Structures are given as C-alpha cells and as structure tokens.
Amino acid sequence: MKERIYPLLFSKNSENFSFNGCNFVVQKAREATARVVMWREFNLINSFTLETTFCGPTDGRYQDCHFTINILKECGRLFCKTLLDYASNEPKVREAIRELETMFPPQKAEEGLSQHFLPNNDDSRK
C-alpha cells in the first residue's frame, strides 16, 4: 500500500489529479515498462506513469476545458510540492496513511501501513 501514499497526497494538492483514476494493478501489457521493471528488479515502489488527456478533466474548475500549457505547468509545480510534502511533511503523510488504512483496511492490526512506513512512536522528530 506504500505506493498509494504519494498519489493520494498529489490528489489532495492538485484538483486535476484523480486518486480514484489511479490503477495500481500491473497489467500483462505493462510488464516491460520501466516502472514495472524498476519495481520488480529493485523494489522501487514510487515509480509512476503520469498521463493526461488533451480534453481535460471531467470535474473541478477546469471541467470540460482543454488543458493549456499553464495548467500543465501548474500540475508540474504541484507535483514538485507533493514531493516535498512526501519527503518532509510527516503530519500530511500520517494523515494520508490513516485515510488509506480506512479505504483499504489491513488484514491484521500489525500489518497497518503506519507500522512499516513511519518512524517509531518514540521518534524524536514528533
């Protein structure tokens, strides 16, 4: 479930990115893509393909509008902001993990994402 944290954070930062539109299943036709190879060979979980459509989003403030260069630049800016959040904003990451654990409950309490992704509760960075 770790691979879902960044996309969830990005969807909260950018109204033009849909977490619900994400597909985390590896399809047979995608087996040779760089992101799948990096995941399988090097256990790199944060390798994604970001796709957009010329036609624009189906909801939000840009609904039914074509994406412009400025909208795509804004998307890039928010992508970078989300990288910063992911790397250095522990409260936002904790909130995303709680939300993901609600959306996709772990089988056992000890298998929760926060047990494996976040520092121990006695971590001095609190």
Model-predicted segments: where are they?
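Structured catalytic-domain cores with a bias toward divalent-metal coordination
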Residues: M1-K126
